[in-house]
């Protein structure tokens, strides 16, 4: 990040989040001074191989990636980006998802990914909020609302037909598309995928350029190529085939010291590049200057080739495939008769049709409901004053709350005290209602909401109850759609009704109470607490490696609907019984972040659910609590239990030490953290 920021490039966080200490001061306008060491910013416990920074250096990665696991994706993370990249696939293992082994999830990685150290983390093969091009357009809209200043990028893998997909991406209002080649070098990928999946970036890039030009879409979107790019010659060829930008990964890693031992997934990298072992990390010898020098050589080679071609401006190279030719590099019988005409083909389009990006996408943000909400919330955003009002919402109002949350985080990176902003709404929340809702905002909706409600929630609160005109049984009626609370990292949600499929998929720390779910509830969950007061669908807890779910098993058949390959089903004991039979180190953490008995956690959440939604089911369970508690089943992931045992054996806490941003916030004189300020919680009358 330091090297790329020095030369005006962009570094990519990859999947897994970024330490707020790397960007929080920069966004506040506090520059890095000469002589500052990187450990001064991130902390001695995080940095092993230390080095000195220059005045004006930046540790912020300008490209923030949003992958299927949504690890570390918070409102603040998105707000700190110049570009937000949706990783649909990667060249080394297209369409396969991934897994970070528990052995590589250190305290610091657990902090960044909102997980418990030692717990393996699974990235699903698909984005569970993308099943069509319309869903992709929705996610692009969500991210653009969270950060209006950032470009939205979509990463695709070179394959036959990728041009058609890229055209759909452009129509979905993406600002940028990446075509990744099959040579992707992710060291933790399966060897079979690295060797056999995907096609060269040259083929995918040529098809993308031709398709976009023919459909008059090329002017609206920037195209980037990557996949084992190493030289200035690669850059020029990429530009001639239609690329505006170029991604480098393996070559800069080698410059920093990578010797390609193919041990990335084993945590035993001998040069400290891809390991969390502090002894091995101390061997890291890379410096920002090494990467800067490498890119100067790449740029110089590209300049020389441009001079040979008689091209003055790099923009004039883009799409000039007519300047490419072939010559025999090898003699091989398989290469005989190959025809490259389709790669070098120039689309038959009028001369005035642009071959590169010359305009920006219209995302229609001026028409968003959040524009009105932000205006009403200015006293809270600018001065921290409490704001409370009512507003109507309709299902055409998409992504309500994301733009407001982004604005809040820009003024108050740590969020605001609870319920500083309280908005009571009536009607139907559209897609992604309450997405990325920041700390200090409460949405109290009387009505219902569509798919993706609470996606990426980052400390806010959502409470949804049926309309006062509703006369049915909430336990038998859907109140929120599919894929609710996808990747939510903190905050709480209360739904008086049934949720659709994939409720709380990839939940990373938020708390939720619902009165029933569809299939695949709590799939790939890694943290947080879920309470289900009614019946679940099939395949509950598939891939669940962290957090805890409490399910009311009225008919005694929940075990047949639960996927127990990674979880154990336990009774919810009274506090006295649990203290007598269970090591306190294995107790789940409540809202305050300290271990509590299951009885206390569960009862408190049901009480909160009743307070916020007036749930009849919650009242019924509380009125006969001892009998109700006996019918609850605790879904406890085996990985989580093992990690807690190991941490207890080592005498460690499950929360990592404060990093630079947290330490500086704690030590700032005369300033109280938002979390230190208490305010009474109560729903609107």
Q: Where is each model-derived feature located?
A:
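Conserved internal helical-beta-strand scaffold that buttresses enzyme catalytic cores
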Residues: 1-150, 160-162, 350, 357-368, ...
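Short acidic (Asp/Glu) and glycine-rich catalytic loops that position anionic groups and cofactors
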Residues: 10, 116-120, 145-146, 184-188, ...
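Terminal amphipathic helices with adjacent charged low-complexity linkers/tails
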Residues: 13-72, 79, 103-105, 155, ...
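Alpha/beta enzyme core
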Residues: 71-226, 230-261, 265-275, 303, ...
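Catalytic cores of large soluble enzymes that bind and process phosphate-bearing ligands
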Residues: 76-78, 97-100, 104, 124-135, ...
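A structural signal for short secondary-structure junctions
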Residues: 78, 217-218, 298-300, 524-525, ...
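Long hydrophobic segments that form regular secondary structure
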Residues: 149, 242, 302-319, 324, ...
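Long, distal/terminal scaffolding or interaction modules
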Residues: 280, 292, 306-309, 318-319, ...
């Amino acid at each position: 990040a330091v090297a790329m920021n020095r030369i005006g490039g962009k570094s990519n966080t990859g999947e897994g989040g970024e330490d707020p200490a790397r960007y929080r001061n920069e966004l506040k306008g506090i520059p890095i001074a000469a002589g500052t060491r990187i450990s001064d910013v991130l902390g001695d416990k995080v940095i092993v191989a230390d080095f000195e920074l220059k005045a004006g250096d930046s540790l912020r990665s300008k490209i923030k990636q949003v992958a299927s696991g949504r690890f570390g994706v918070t409102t603040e993370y998105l707000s700190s980006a110049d570009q937000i990249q949706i990783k649909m696939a990667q060249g080394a293992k297209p369409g396969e998802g991934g897994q970070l082994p528990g052995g590589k999830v250190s305290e610091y990685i657990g902090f960044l990914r909102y997980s418990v150290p030692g717990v393996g983390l699974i990235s699903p093969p698909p984005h569970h909020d993308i099943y069509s091009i319309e869903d992709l357009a929705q996610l692009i809209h969500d991210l653009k609302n969270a950060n209006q200043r950032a470009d939205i990028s979509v990463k695709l893998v070179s394959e036959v037909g990728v041009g058609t997909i890229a055209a759909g991406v452009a129509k979905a209002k993406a600002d940028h598309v990446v075509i990744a080649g099959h040579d992707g070098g992710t060291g933790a990928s399966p060897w079979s995928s690295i060797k056999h999946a995907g096609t060269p970036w040259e083929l995918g890039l040529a098809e993308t350029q031709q398709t976009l030009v023919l459909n008059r879409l090329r002017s609206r979107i920037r195209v980037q190529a990557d996949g084992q790019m190493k030289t200035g010659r690669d850059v020029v060829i990429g530009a001639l085939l239609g690329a505006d930008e170029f991604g480098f990964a393996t070559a800069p890693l080698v410059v920093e010291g990578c010797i390609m031992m193919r041990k990335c997934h084993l945590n035993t990298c001998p040069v400290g590049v891809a390991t969390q072992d502090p002894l091995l990390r101390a061997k890291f010898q890379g410096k920002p200057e090494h990467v800067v020098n490498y890119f100067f050589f790449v740029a110089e080679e590209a300049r020389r080739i441009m001079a040979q071609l008689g091209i003055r401006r790099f923009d004039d190279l883009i799409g000039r495939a007519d300047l490419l030719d072939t010559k025999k590099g090898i003699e091989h019988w398989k290469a005989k008769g190959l025809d490259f005409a389709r790669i070098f083909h120039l689309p038959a389009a009028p001369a005035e049709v642009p071959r590169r990006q010359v305009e920006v996408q219209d995302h229609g943000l001026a028409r968003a409901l959040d524009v009105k909400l932000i205006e009403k919330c200015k006293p809270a955003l600018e001065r921290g004053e409490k704001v409370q009002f009512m507003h109507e919402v309709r299902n055409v109002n998409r992504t309500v709350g994301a733009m407001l949350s982004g604005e809040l985080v820009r003024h108050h990176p740590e969020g605001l005290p609870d319920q500083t902003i309280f908005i009571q709404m009536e009607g139907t929340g559209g897609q992604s209602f309450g997405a990325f809702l920041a700390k200090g905002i409460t949405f109290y909706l009387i009505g219902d909401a569509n798919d993706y409600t609470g996606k990426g929630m980052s400390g806010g609160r959502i409470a949804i109850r049926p309309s006062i005109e509703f006369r049915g049984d909430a336990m038998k009626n859907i109140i929120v759609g599919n894929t609710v609370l996808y990747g939510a990292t903190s905050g709480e949600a209360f739904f008086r009704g049934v949720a659709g499929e994939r409720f709380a998929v990839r939940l990373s720390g938020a708390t939720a109470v619902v009165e029933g779910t569809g299939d695949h509830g709590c799939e790939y969950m890694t943290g947080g607490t879920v309470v289900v007061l009614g019946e679940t669908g099939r395949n509950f807890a598939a891939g669940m490696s962290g957090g805890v779910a409490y399910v009311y098993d009225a008919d005694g058949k929940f075990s047949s609907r639960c996927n127990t390959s990674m979880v154990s089903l336990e009774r919810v004991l009274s506090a006295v019984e649990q203290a007598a039979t269970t090591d306190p180190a294995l107790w789940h953490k409540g809202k305050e972040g300290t271990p509590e008995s299951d009885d206390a956690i569960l009862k408190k959440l049901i009480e909160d659910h009743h307070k916020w939604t007036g749930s009849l089911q919650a009242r019924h369970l509380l009125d006969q609590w001892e009998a109700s508690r006996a019918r609850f089943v605790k879904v406890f992931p085996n990985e989580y239990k093992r990690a807690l045992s190991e941490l207890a054996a080592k005498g460690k806490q499950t929360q990592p030490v404060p990093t630079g941003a947290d330490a500086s916030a704690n030590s700032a004189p005369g300033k109280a953290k938002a979390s230190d300020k208490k305010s009474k919680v109560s729903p609107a009358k």
